[in-house]
Amino acid sequence: MKTFLASLAALLPVVALAHDYSVNDLMVMHPVAKETTATARSSAGYFTITNNGDAADRLIGVEADFPRVMMHNTVVQDGVASMRHMDAVILEPGQTVTFEPGGFHVMFMGLSEPMTEGEEIPATLIFENAGRLDIVFKVEKIEAKDHSDHNH
């Protein structure tokens, strides 16, 4: 019994860090938003989506309590990176799509105060077929250059 309890206790930090969500055959894993500076007017959100089903679906929107929330993709053309608005992200059967720095990401725009480490940002992902999925972005410290200081 002691071995079982010790094993269970060892897993608790991992379980506490994991925050996954699912709707139908879609799994959304580890949504995070990056901590911002005091003057930042936007921040980026990241997560991974896996379609475990037999049919394609599309992520067609993200809602959160900010003046504007948009899906973007970073595109590099002639050595210059730019953000392109995405109306939808296609999720083929068996496919995993990662929203990450330098690729797909969610922009939270019009911040009135900084996002701070440990804060939780409620949001809703809207899928064409699976419908709405409420998730929570956990705010983490800035570890690498991201889009926190972009003004769109």
Locations of regions flagged by a protein language model:
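Compact, glycine-rich, soluble single-domain proteins
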Residues: 19-152
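Hydrophobic alpha-helical transmembrane segments of integral membrane proteins
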Residues: 9-10
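N-terminal signal peptide c-region/cleavage motif recognized by signal peptidases
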Residues: 13-15
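Positively charged n-region of N-terminal signal peptides that target proteins for export
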Residues: 1-4
